[in-house]
């Protein structure tokens, strides 16, 4: 089979020097096969002001891009090989070891490391045991075929090269909805990550496109572009078949005839017969072998052994042996090997002198002063609009919103700081552009008189008051007559000053200097490099800046500004000449681009609602989905699609998550709130609506066929039967399986109910729910759609006749799942959620899995944050250390007291974070947690109230009142257990203070509310003031002195268990 699969004509470009290195990889006629350079080479700037990179390379006479027939599977591989060879790639061979993706082939992982250029393309059969479906699922295979491309360094037009490759496959890119949808890729095994996209065609992911930032835990320079095609998906779409086995592989033979039996037998092995014990040993053997090879200085065979460990792990995972936490441990072992292989490979290539050469960094363009002077000659006196547009490859939706507003604020600050008068300042954003438009901006600055400081007066004038050379120099520098200088004291020194009128500089000159700086200030949650020192959300490909009809000349990220923007990808107007800033909005509108975010939302809602009404339905519009979809498109085109009504028999949550999360579709419901068999997809730009609608329907059908397959597998059993399957899912090597974890939870719940003061009548419900907890982790649906954990547990429990209370608790054990998520509503769900998190925290800390400052592979920060969120929002007072000890008592390994204390401190820091996130000052938080951290609910309530009280009149007074006795007794030998002797009092102030203390001390206790503590403590303010005004504490007579210290010590200790006031301002 392997011979059939890969005995294809190859066009192999050997690595040899060529005379004329080129910047762009451009399609050439297929008879030509350019070679990759072995020499050091230099790339010119990525983009010029003429937007060279936006040229359309689609030539109707070119063999690569003209319309071609639908290819067979074999022809598709041939066409991609020929196309990428024609633009300068060497066509390589697949790995001879099982890999889960083309990324793991040494041609990618090892070759993206280091400075050597590398442009390759190859087919990679990717083995994923977890996707085994016996050939029954139409869209899932344990061995699927990727086509992998690596471009190193980024040529600057890699997106266009990819789109041209689709044309080479025979795809009409003007008819289809081709989109770049955010995908932040990472490989925990390889210590690799990058930013880029899933590339969708009519809603189906056909390719992954990534700018590698790191590999082997090492930063990459230069950055490589990875393009990974999913060939089965693409060919099914092109051949319009609904099952992989129907793909025409070559003339007269189908994919199924070649590979269906392989799918059946390998699925049987991976899912049923693979020996877990032997595979664990294999993993250890391969790991040991890799380390021995690394010690011998052999990175290539060592990496081959790493690939074998990865495949062994994947089979163990498919057998259901790897739990969430154990996964992180295996990943850590493999990541360590990957890092060592990477380091050794780099050292080896360096020792060889980098045989393929060194990729040079681009030289940034220089904004010559002469260019600015030339433009300045054309400046008019009249105010004109100013426009700046930062053109990028597709940014993530949230980045569009945040960055466009940041740019608006930064431009506004620049205008104010530089004294440039202006009208309205508006921000716009689309996936490919950040825009700020300023109305009526003046052509030059306002003049301003400012005070400038010169030399000290003692140096500016001699003893007789005559100006020195220092004064003359200062006068000359600012053009101010000597007699206009004046003296002014600053601090303890007298200086010479002068009033100076700052000249009005041209706006063009000021903007040219300052714009690069403000663009560099735009920040993103995740930024990337693309062979430039600049970090940005995605690569910047053009910059347009105009004041009126004049270009504001500057450079940023290796790009010079100009007056050219870019149109929609799938239109003829790839480049748009903007005549002046005033015409920008019309230019965009006429090209079909809607730059206003709110306007795009409005278009989506209006057209989608109309489409929903056309089928007697109502649109379901989650706000976060609308925000996302509106910023995935520049020209929204809502389309209505239909799916088979039989799919409505699946759980609504399953259908909805596929539509909304996976496909970004809006669902449609009837008047009663039931799903209708329709959806709304939002396409982008000028497309063939029938083609795109048909494609999206096919994609959703495939998704729902997957979901149906998983659901039918699950419903062959009762839900309780999945409980025993948890025995096959490892939680952690030292903590046992998920079944062991569930049993620990069962042991905890009765005592936990008592600690949380839960009604004892609810205990049977909690215990029954605990016996089923987490069972859905063994179901096929949750394995595939992990976000449905808990949701499917509730569904399957209700389906099997369990009570609503039990079913709801099975959902709520997972809550909250993320920041801002809801918390459990029922007490039964709350007990399970708290117990599960306590078990995870104590167990994993005991197993040595504490997070570091930079790494939290088990998500313990999220778990603990959710735990305190539940306790606080459910208003449950609990002795936290006691419930930690309860969790410690059921662990399979001994938990030391210091481990419990470590968990306590760790969770307390999360509580501190939660309170600060909710607006409590850090000082107040620390003061409360120092005394009440063991009861998170009471601590939070105290912190919120203290924050409010601290802004009033009463609370600062008691802070000051308690501060004086505390400071006096601090460090003094007051004596342990020394009691106050009333007979030792010598003054009425002592007696009054003691009397006040004794009247309130029993009313202040560890559970008192802070407002009551404050009100009661106010009774001490006046007696304390009288005491300190009239009584000297540290008298000579020891008996009196110690008695007074004991009195003050008793008062200083009153806040203990309530609040530590020493953390607060004014103490």
UniProtKB/Swiss-Prot annotation:
GO terms for biological process: embryo development ending in seed dormancy; glycyl-tRNA aminoacylation; regulation of embryonic development. One of its GO terms (cellular component) is mitochondrion. The keyword Aminoacyl-tRNA synthetase applies. Residues 1-50 form a transit peptide. It catalyses: tRNA(Gly) + glycine + ATP = glycyl-tRNA(Gly) + AMP + diphosphate. Its EC number is 6.1.1.14. Catalyzes the attachment of glycine to tRNA(Gly). Is also able produce diadenosine tetraphosphate (Ap4A), a universal pleiotropic signaling molecule needed for cell regulation pathways, by direct condensation of 2 ATPs. Belongs to the class-II aminoacyl-tRNA synthetase family. HAMAP family: Gly_tRNA_synth_alpha, Gly_tRNA_synth_beta. This is Glycine--tRNA ligase, chloroplastic/mitochondrial 2. It comes from Arabidopsis thaliana (Mouse-ear cress).
């Amino acid at each position: 089979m392997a011979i059939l699969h890969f005995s294809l004509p190859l066009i192999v470009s050997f690595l040899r020097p060529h005379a004329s290195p080129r910047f762009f990889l451009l399609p050439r006629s297929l008879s030509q096969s350019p070679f990759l350079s072995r020499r050091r080479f230099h790339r010119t700037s990525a983009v010029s002001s003429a937007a060279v990179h936006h040229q359309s390379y689609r030539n109707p006479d070119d063999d690569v891009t003209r319309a071609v027939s639908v290819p067979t599977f074999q022809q598709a591989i041939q066409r991609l090989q020929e196309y990428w060879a024609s633009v300068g790639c060497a066509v390589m061979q697949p790995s001879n070891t099982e890999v889960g993706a083309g990324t793991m082939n040494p041609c990618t992982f090892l070759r993206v490391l280091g400075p050597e250029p590398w442009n390759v393309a190859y087919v990679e059969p990717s083995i994923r045991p977890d996707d085994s479906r016996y050939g029954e699922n139409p869209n899932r295979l344990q061995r699927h075929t990727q086509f992998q491309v690596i471009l190193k360094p980024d040529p600057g037009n890699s997106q266009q090269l990819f789109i041209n490759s689709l044309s080479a496959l025979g795809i009409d890119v003007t008819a289809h909805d081709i989109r770049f949808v955010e995908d932040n890729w990472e490989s925990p095994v390889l210590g690799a990550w990058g930013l880029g996209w899933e590339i969708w065609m009519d809603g189906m992911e056909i390719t992954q496109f990534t700018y590698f930032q790191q590999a082997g835990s090492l930063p990459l320079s230069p950055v490589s572009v990875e393009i990974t095609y999913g060939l089965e998906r693409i060919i099914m779409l092109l051949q319009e078949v609904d099952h992989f086995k129907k793909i025409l592989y070559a003339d007269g033979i189908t994919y199924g005839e070649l590979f269906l039996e392989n799918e059946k037998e390998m699925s049987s092995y991976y899912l049923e017969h693979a020996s877990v014990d032997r595979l664990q040993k294999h993993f250890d053997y391969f790991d040991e072998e890799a380390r021995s090879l690394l010690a011998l200085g052999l990175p290539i065979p060592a990496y081959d052994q790493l690939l074998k460990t990865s495949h062994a792990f994947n089979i163990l995972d498919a057998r259901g042996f790897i739990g969430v936490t154990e996964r992180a441990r295996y990943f850590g072992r493999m990541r360590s090997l990957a890092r060592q292989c990477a380091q050794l490979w780099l050292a080896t290539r360096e020792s060889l002198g980098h045989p393929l050469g060194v990729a040079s960094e681009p030289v940034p363009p220089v904004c010559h002063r002469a260019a600015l002077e030339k433009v300045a000659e054309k400046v008019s006196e009249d105010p004109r609009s100013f426009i700046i547009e930062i053109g990028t490859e597709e940014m993530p939706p949230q980045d569009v919103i945040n960055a466009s507003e940041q740019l608006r604020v930064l431009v506004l600050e620049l205008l104010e700081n530089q004294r440039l008068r202006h009208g309205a300042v508006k921000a716009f954003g689309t996936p490919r552009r950040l825009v700020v438009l300023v109305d009526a901006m003046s052509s030059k600055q306002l003049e301003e008189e400012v005070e400038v400081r010169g030399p000290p007066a003692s140096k500016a004038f001699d003893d007789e008051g005559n100006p020195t050379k220092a004064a003359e120099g200062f006068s000359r520098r600012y053009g101010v007559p000597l007699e206009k200088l004046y003296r002014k004291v600053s601090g303890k020194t007298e200086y010479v000053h002068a009033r100076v009128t700052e000249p009005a500089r041209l706006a063009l000159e000021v903007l040219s200097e300052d714009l690069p700086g403000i663009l560099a200030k735009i920040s993103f949650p995740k930024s990337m490099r693309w062979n430039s020192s600049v970090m940005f959300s995605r690569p910047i490909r053009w910059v347009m800046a105009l004041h009126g009809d004049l270009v504001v000349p500057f450079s940023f990220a290796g790009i010079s500004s100009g007056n050219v923007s870019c149109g929609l990808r799938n239109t003829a107007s790839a480049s748009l000449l903007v005549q002046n800033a005033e015409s920008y909005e019309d230019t965009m509108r006429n090209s079909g681009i809607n730059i206003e975010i709110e306007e795009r939302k409005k278009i989506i809602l209006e057209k989608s609602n109309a489409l929903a009404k056309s089928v007697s339905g109502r649109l379901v519009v989650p706000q976060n989905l609308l925000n996302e979809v509106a910023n995935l498109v520049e020209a929204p085109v809502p389309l209505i699609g239909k799916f088979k009504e039989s799919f409505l028999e699946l759980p609504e949550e399953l259908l909805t998550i596929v539509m909304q999360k996976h496909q970004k579709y809006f669902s449609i419901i009837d008047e009663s709130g039931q799903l209708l068999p329709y959806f709304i997809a939002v396409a982008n730009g000028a497309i063939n609506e029938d083609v795109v609608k048909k494609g999206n329907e096919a994609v959703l059908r495939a998704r729902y066929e997957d979901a149906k397959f998983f659901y039918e597998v699950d419903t062959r059993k009762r839900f309780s039967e999945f409980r025993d399957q948890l025995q096959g899912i490892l939680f952690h090597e030292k903590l046992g399986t998920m079944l062991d974890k569930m049993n620990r939870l069962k042991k905890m719940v009765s005592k936990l109910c008592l600690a949380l003061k839960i009604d004892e009548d609810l205990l049977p419900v909690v215990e029954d729910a605990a016996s089923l907890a987490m069972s859905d982790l063994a179901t096929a649906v949750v394995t595939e759609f992990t976000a449905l954990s808990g949701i499917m547990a509730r569904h399957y429990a209700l389906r099997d006749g369990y009570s609503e209370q039990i079913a709801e608790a099975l959902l709520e054990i997972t809550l909250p799942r993320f920041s801002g998520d809801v918390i459990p509503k029922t007490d039964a769900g709350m007990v399970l959620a708290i117990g599960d998190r306590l078990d995870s925290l104590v167990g994993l800390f005991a197993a040595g899995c504490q997070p570091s400052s930079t790494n939290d592979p088990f998500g313990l920060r999220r778990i603990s944050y959710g735990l305190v969120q539940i306790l606080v929002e459910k208003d449950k007072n609990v002795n936290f250390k006691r419930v930690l000890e309860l969790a410690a008592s059921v662990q399979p390994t001994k938990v030391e007291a210091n481990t419990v204390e470590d968990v306590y401190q760790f969770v307390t820091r999360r509580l501190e974070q939660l309170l600060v996130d909710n607006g409590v000052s850090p000082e107040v938080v620390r003061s409360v947690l120092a005394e009440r951290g063991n009861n998170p609910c009471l601590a939070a309530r105290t912190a919120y109230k203290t924050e409010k009280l601290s802004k009033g009149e009463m609370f600062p007074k008691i802070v000051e009142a308690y501060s004086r006795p505390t400071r006096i007794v601090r460090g003094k030998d007051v004596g342990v257990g020394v009691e106050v002797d009333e007979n030792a009092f010598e003054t009425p102030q002592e007696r009054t203070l003691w009397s006040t203390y004794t009247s309130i001390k029993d009313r202040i206790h560890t559970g008192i509310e802070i407002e009551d503590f404050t009100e009661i403590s106010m009774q001490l303010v006046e007696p304390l003031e009288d005491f300190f005004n009239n009584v000297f504490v540290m008298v000579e007579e020891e008996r009196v002195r110690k008695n007074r210290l004991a009195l003050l010590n008793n008062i200083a200790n009153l806040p203990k268990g309530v609040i530590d006031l020493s953390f607060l301002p004014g103490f």
